[in-house]
From Swiss-Prot:
Protein species of origin: Felis catus
Protein's name according to its UniProt entry: Sodium-dependent phosphate transporter 2
Polar residues bias spans: 295-304
Quaternary data: Homodimer.
Disulfide bonds: none
Length: 653
């Protein structure tokens, strides 16, 4: 059958297929490296580099099997024997419908399934072309069933693996020995699965025709050799690396403690750059003691009629402002004294130049080293009412172990910090404006953590009528120790690469499956598509996926790697290994499961095991709803394009 007149459709198909591959990379890339980026074991740039290598390799070696299912397993192509151009138009419509919806979802940061998109789009154009008889509904039922089976199976496998790791490694007093013993097993399992997948699924591409027992034997042998290599070389190197890291941290902590204990009470390097302040009588008052100042200067030193307040290790003025010699802005330093005797300072700066400097004020010293009367300082937060940084500075302990020196305070001192009555490890303060922090900054609790300091009014904490969380009942989120982080850091990189390899093999079919059908129809002039999937088309799809990853992949990575549940290297390793194992098995049997479903199932299962409160169930609900929406929406887009081609273009060409 002469179809040379439809070359324009093939060219259009190649362009749309690349856009479709781009959308697959932008959305589904989070399935392979989202958890690795979320746990911090790799940066976004490193993830893009590794994913580019393994996505492309996986697409070339594993993509042919699933691509055949996408091309011929959803609709009966024999019904198009007399209308080849209609099937070609349908393949173009399927790619357009899938690409449009995935690009919209990526823009909305919504992780959806590329498999869902292409299946829905294929059904959509078939309904327009020849009605319901063109759809193999039993195959569709199997595919829909796999959408539920894949997250459940992947979640179950991830959960079991994480429980075993937690029992035998994470919960041990010293997790390193058991972790090092398990390394060869983990690496061997990963290598065995990959080798088996390449030799079994990619055998036609590689020109290998081997029985299954031979493939299994070769895979086991390669895995055994790799396990010996890990045991002899990687484990000793990892042991030295962990020991060196722990020794370095201990040495730095010891040196820091010794250095801080030698700092003079009147000497504060933090303020050496700051000039003197102007008091109300225009007399110059230094913000900190200088080298020439007598070391015996007391905290109660006064200058003129203006008392000098203690400022951590430095002595500072409670009123005035000064022009900074190292910036173009004004460094305001205003004092507010309340009836409780505490001095509150507002620091204004119209640029972020002093952010780090002021951050050091409160962190220069631990509470166990300062007298009970000395001040402690808070982290800076962006003031919502001003384009400057506002810091509330007052005498306030950050740890519950730091007790007030005068336990027999007068009743009016209850206006001060709640002290012993609260835990400083949980509650935090929040202030949003200049006036609110001035009025309430002392009546709060504080916690310094990786995300900064939030603030909550102490009036809420001390009010007996207010409900309060019971720390004993609150489930604590498990966090990896330093040695566990190092141990699983390397493992998660490997499993992320494994996941990327599996993702490329499974999802490249979503991008170039219709393109392969379009090309084979044009080349052979028939709809049966008997030829093997060309390797160069698989590579073309892999390049498109990598392009989408580099340009737009970070949007959905945020959702999968951080928003759904916090990820640590140990949990990330479990998620990656179990979900990738599920995907590879499905790819080998030719079942187009969704890598999104597998990864989401693993993330939720492991997050729920770590802590039920660690999972964002609202986000999970939205993702679950999106799984159902994707098929009909992609089908509608595809049906619209198919109607346009059939009734608006094909009759006139």
């Amino acid at each position: 059958m002469a179809i040379d007149g439809y070359l324009w459709m093939v060219i259009l198909g190649f362009i749309i297929a690349f856009i479709l591959a781009f959308s697959v990379g932008a959305n589904d890339v989070a399935n392979s490296f989202g958890t690795a980026v979320g746990s911090g074991v790799v940066t976004l740039r490193q993830a893009c580099i590794l994913a580019s290598i393994f996505e492309t390799t996986g697409s070339v070696l594993l993509g042919a099997k699933v691509g055949e299912t996408i091309r011929k397993g959803i609709i009966d192509v024999n019904l198009y024997n007399e209308t080849v151009e209609t099937l070609m138009a349908g393949e173009v419509s399927a790619m357009v419908g899938s690409a449009v919806w995935q690009l919209i979802a990526s823009f909305l940061r919504l992780p959806i399934s590329g498999t869902h998109c292409i299946v829905g789009s294929t059904i959509g154009f078939s309904l327009v072309a020849i009605g319901t008889q063109g759809v193999q509904w039993m195959e569709l039922v199997k595919i829909v069933a796999s959408w539920f089976i894949s997250p459940l199976l992947s979640g179950f496998m991830s959960g079991v693996l994480f429980i075993l790791i937690r029992i035998f490694i994470l919960k041990k007093e010293d997790p390193v020995p058991n972790g090092l013993r398990a390394l060869p097993v983990f690496y061997a399992a990963t290598i065995a699965i990959n080798v088996f997948s390449i030799m079994y699924t990619g055998a036609p591409v590689l020109g290998l025709v081997l029985p299954i027992w031979a493939i299994a034997l070769i895979s086991f042998g390669v895995a055994l050799l790799f396990a010996l290599f890990v045991w002899l070389f990687v484990c000793p190197w990892m042991r030295r690396k962990i020991a060196g890291k722990l020794q370095k941290e201990a040495a730095l902590s010891r040196v820091s403690d010794e250095s801080l204990s030698k700092i003079q009470e009147v000497e504060s390097p933090v303020f050496k750059e700051l000039p003197g302040a102007k008091a109300n009588d225009d007399s110059t008052v230094p913000l900190t003691g200088s080298a020439g100042e007598p070391s015996g200067t007391s905290e109660g030193t006064s200058v003129g009629n203006h008392p000098r307040a203690s400022y951590g290790r430095a002595l500072s003025m409670t009123h005035g402002s000064a022009k900074s010699p190292v910036s173009n802005g004004t460094f305001g330093f205003d004092g507010h004294t309340r009836s409780d005797g505490h001095v509150y300072h507002t620091v204004h700066k119209d640029s972020g130049l002093y952010k780090d400097l002021l951050h050091r004020i409160h962190s220069d010293r631990g509470p166990e080293e300062r007298p009970a009367q000395e001040n402690n300082y808070r982290f800076l937060r962006r003031n919502n009412s001003y384009t400057c940084y506002t810091a509330a500075i007052c005498g306030m302990p950050v740890h519950s172990t730091f007790k007030a020196a005068d336990s027999s305070s007068a009743p009016e001192d209850s206006e001060k910090l709640v002290g012993d009555a609260v835990s400083y490890s949980k509650k935090r303060l929040r202030y949003d404006s200049y006036s609110s922090y001035c009025n309430a900054v002392a009546e709060a609790e504080i916690e310094a953590d990786e995300g900064g300091v939030e603030m909550k009014l102490a009036s809420e904490l001390t009010d007996p009528d207010q409900p309060r969380d019971d720390p004993a009942e609150e489930e604590k989120e498990e966090k990896d120790t330093a040695e566990v982080h190092l141990l699983f850091h390397f493992l998660q990189v490997l499993t992320a690469c494994f996941g990327s390899f599996a993702h490329g093999g499974n999802d490249v079919s979503n991008a170039i499956g219709p393109l392969v059908a379009l090309w084979l129809i044009y080349e052979q002039g028939a709809v049966l598509q008997e030829a093997v999937t060309p390797v160069w088309l698989l590579f073309y799809g892999g390049v498109g996926i990598c392009t989408g990853l580099w340009v737009w992949g970070r949007r959905v990575i945020q959702t999968m790697g951080k928003d759904l549940t916090p990820i640590t290297p140990s949990s990330g390793f479990t998620i990656e290994l179990a979900s990738a194992f599920t995907v590879v098995i499905a790819s080998n049997v030719g079942l187009p499961v969704s890598t999104t479903h597998c990864k989401v199932g693993s993330v939720v299962a492991v997050g729920w095991i770590r802590s039920r409160k660690a999972v964002d169930w609202r986000l999970f609900r939205n993702i679950f709803v999106a799984w159902f929406v994707t098929v009909p929406v992609a089908g509608l887009f595809s049906a619209a394009i198919m109607a346009l081609l059939m009734y608006g273009i094909l009759p006139y060409v």
